Amino acid sequence: MNLTPREKDKLLISMAAMVARRRLERGVKLNHPEAIALITDFVVEGARDGRSVAELMEAGAHVLTRDQVMEGIAEMIHDIQVEATFPDGTKLVTVHEPIR
């Protein structure tokens, strides 16, 4: 299987998001990379499902709460920018203050 660097990045993010979901199910608080991966995966999959950029910008800010991440993580992440593939092309989605 020959994957492009972009495809490899998508798979890595997807796998990290799976790990993050399993940890949340066990009640483990997420660290910085896990939180980023989970929100990024949410946006990428939402784009594939046909949701709008505006909808994902809003919904992406409700994927995680402060109680689900380690202390100080919410303050470290101000914006997450995701280049996602929508039915009408690739667009940049910015989620502002993603952990509230």
From Swiss-Prot:
Heterotrimer of UreA (gamma), UreB (beta) and UreC (alpha) subunits. Three heterotrimers associate to form the active enzyme. Pfam families: Urease_gamma. It comes from Rhizobium meliloti (strain 1021). Its EC number is 3.5.1.5. It is found in: Cytoplasm. The gene is ureA. GO terms for molecular function: nickel cation binding; urease activity. Pathway: Nitrogen metabolism; urea degradation; CO(2) and NH(3) from urea (urease route): step 1/1. It catalyses: urea + 2 H2O + H(+) = hydrogencarbonate + 2 NH4(+). GO terms for biological process: urea catabolic process. Keywords: Cytoplasm, Hydrolase. SUPFAM superfamilies: Urease, gamma-subunit. Belongs to the urease gamma subunit family. This is Urease subunit gamma. Its main location: cytoplasm. GO terms for cellular component: cytoplasm. CDD domains: Urease_gamma (cd00390). Coiled coil: none annotated.
